């Protein structure tokens, strides 16, 4: 019985990165051997055990065989005769198919170290095509490390998409990998790789439809709506924004794909036109509520947020109410963060100031100076409870108006 450190721990060690989780493979053992040594079985799908002291995962070396479409259609074989190389061969990418023995020696039968040095993501074997999740994983690793995907691997990924493997992906797995990819250092790279292999058209057709749609060059020197979306997403990542904010950045301009061709490159109403596509994506991916709500909010209101200097005080108040800013000020702030990414996610505009954010927050703070509790109590005391909302609005407008006048005159 021999144990080896495998997978991501070896990869990150060789890259000089912190090793977060350590996974082990056991060669020359079976379930009875593991149980006799005090290991605890985990689940029943795979022969995986928890170490009695470290609680790290130890898996019996195994081979896998495709039995049906999708990521779940596998059967496995694990016994004492399965070799380390056979176990490593079933893994997705060469950089993940390395092991380290107890003496620190690296076992690398498929050239993972070579590909790490070259910055290449390459599939280990044709079995890569048996699991459609690997399309998403390869794109995610490209986003994490900035690596390129080998041409033969991209070709295989395209074939998988053409064969309908991507159609078999369930929403939970797509969201799981997408969310991880959005939180990587270069999330733009993930979307680019998914588009290059054709998977974006299957998984996020609303985003894929943005590519090739022109915008006004005076607002968008990058011209292409899809390129702007990638730049906005990447700017959100560079700003260190959260997952809901990055997700909203990805979906904020879906309405531009709905613009009638005869009015291009203008996109009047794309904020409103984008709401339904955003909802469709949210439902299809089963996006978490916080992500879904922020994406819809940003899509619907980002143009109005940009144009705050042109708005009347009454419109300002209406926007604050419709966006639920009084009850959910933190979400309102995150929406404005995405608007910064939208403004700066344009060619040669990455340092463009965005005073609108500070002004919106100042307007909200000013409106909150109106004592709604006191106003409500006074109205009730006077038998005019039906005037409460109107009186609160008047008080808020009285606070907003002078501040907005100053900003518009600046």
UniProtKB/Swiss-Prot annotation:
PANTHER family: MULTIFUNCTIONAL CCA PROTEIN. The keyword Hydrolase applies. ATP binds at residues 8, 11, 91, 137, 140. It catalyses: a tRNA precursor + 2 CTP + ATP = a tRNA with a 3' CCA end + 3 diphosphate; a tRNA with a 3' CCA end + 2 CTP + ATP = a tRNA with a 3' CCACCA end + 3 diphosphate. Gene3D superfamilies: Beta Polymerase, domain 2 (3.30.460.10), cca-adding enzyme, domain 2 (1.10.3090.10). NCBIfam families: PRK10885.1. CTP binds at residues 8, 11, 91, 137, 140. CDD domains: HDc, NT_ClassII-CCAase. It comes from Neisseria gonorrhoeae (strain ATCC 700825 / FA 1090). GO terms for molecular function: ATP binding; CCA tRNA nucleotidyltransferase activity; cyclic-nucleotide phosphodiesterase activity; magnesium ion binding; phosphatase activity; tRNA binding. Mg(2+) binds at residues 21, 23. This is Multifunctional CCA protein. Belongs to the tRNA nucleotidyltransferase/poly(A) polymerase family. Bacterial CCA-adding enzyme type 1 subfamily. It comes from the Bacteria. Its EC number is 2.7.7.72, 3.1.3.-, 3.1.4.-. Its cofactor is Mg(2+); Ni(2+). The keyword Nucleotide-binding applies. GO terms for biological process: RNA repair; tRNA 3'-terminal CCA addition. A single active site specifically recognizes both ATP and CTP and is responsible for their addition. Keywords: ATP-binding, Hydrolase, Magnesium, Metal-binding, Multifunctional enzyme, Nickel, Nucleotide-binding, Nucleotidyltransferase, RNA repair, RNA-binding, Transferase, tRNA processing. Monomer. Can also form homodimers and oligomers. SUPFAM superfamilies: Nucleotidyltransferase, Poly A polymerase C-terminal region-like. Catalyzes the addition and repair of the essential 3'-terminal CCA sequence in tRNAs without using a nucleic acid template. Adds these three nucleotides in the order of C, C, and A to the tRNA nucleotide-73, using CTP and ATP as substrates and producing inorganic pyrophosphate. tRNA 3'-terminal CCA addition is required both for tRNA processing and repair. Also involved in tRNA surveillance by mediating tandem CCA addition to generate a CCACCA at the 3' terminus of unstable tRNAs. While stable tRNAs receive only 3'-terminal CCA, unstable tRNAs are marked with CCACCA and rapidly degraded. Magnesium is required for nucleotidyltransferase activity. Nickel for phosphatase activity. Comprises two domains: an N-terminal domain containing the nucleotidyltransferase activity and a C-terminal HD domain associated with both phosphodiesterase and phosphatase activities. Residues 225-326 form the HD domain.
